Amino acid sequence: LEIRNLEKSFGNKQVLFGVDLTAQQGHILGLVGKNGAGKTTIFHSILRFLDYSGEIRLGGKAITQETYKEIGYLPEERSLMPKLTIFEQVRYLAALKGMSTAEVKEKLPTWMEKLQVKGKLTDKIKSLSKGNQQKVQLIITLIHEPKLIILDEPFSGLDPVNTEVLKQVIFEEKERGATIIFSDHVMTNVEELCDDILMIRDGSVVLSGPVQEVRNSYGKTRLFVSNDFSKEELEALPHVTKVTMTKQGTWKLI
């Protein structure tokens, strides 16, 4: 996935400013930022839920209706139809990604076991706990084996046990060769799972690079394009022991 110079405005308010992003195949990219920083707007732009200026390409191609079938998306706001059964709900949305009923019947039990969903295929969505409903939503995201997986706050609301289950599934999808992007407020999740990190503040990218490089970058320089990025926020980054401003107006992290 490649994004170049992505910009977005709602009315007279600009919310994304020249965002560049690269997510490699078989890699996990962590998108970090406060609420309102622009993370979900980036996701919605990739999915073409919004008009935007800039360039977004998946596998070198623009996102089209056919390309969209190669994307799996877990929204921050989970939305399922309470009166449908688990099977009906998954079949309905998987069909939009090109899956047949027979394929859903074959794959759904395996996914329910993998994610430890407590329930039967014939159980109504409304009868499930919130945690199990979230797992069903995740099955819908992954069952068609998408090339690009977008997870908006995937660990929100999960207990520690189910968080570890989801982390294992994310690793397995990476091994399958999927490109994965997820947003999170918790740096420990990003450090544990991600190959690369992109930090966004007020619609602008303020930090990007390999997580391993950030973790081991004692004494190396990081450049930030946002001059109002606070020293306290930088000092909160993993393994940063000292933050100083250079004469050029960039931050040096040690």
Regions from the PLM with identified roles:
Residues Y52-K69:
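Conserved ABC transporter NBD signature motif
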Residues Q168-K252:
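ABC transporter nucleotide-binding domain
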Residues I149-E153:
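Catalytic Walker B motif of ABC-type/P-loop ATPase nucleotide-binding domains
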Residues R91, A95, A102-K120:
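Conserved ABC ATPase "signature" region
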Residues K124-G131:
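Conserved ABC ATPase signature
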Residues V32-K34:
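The feature captures the beta-strand-to-loop junction immediately N-terminal to the Walker
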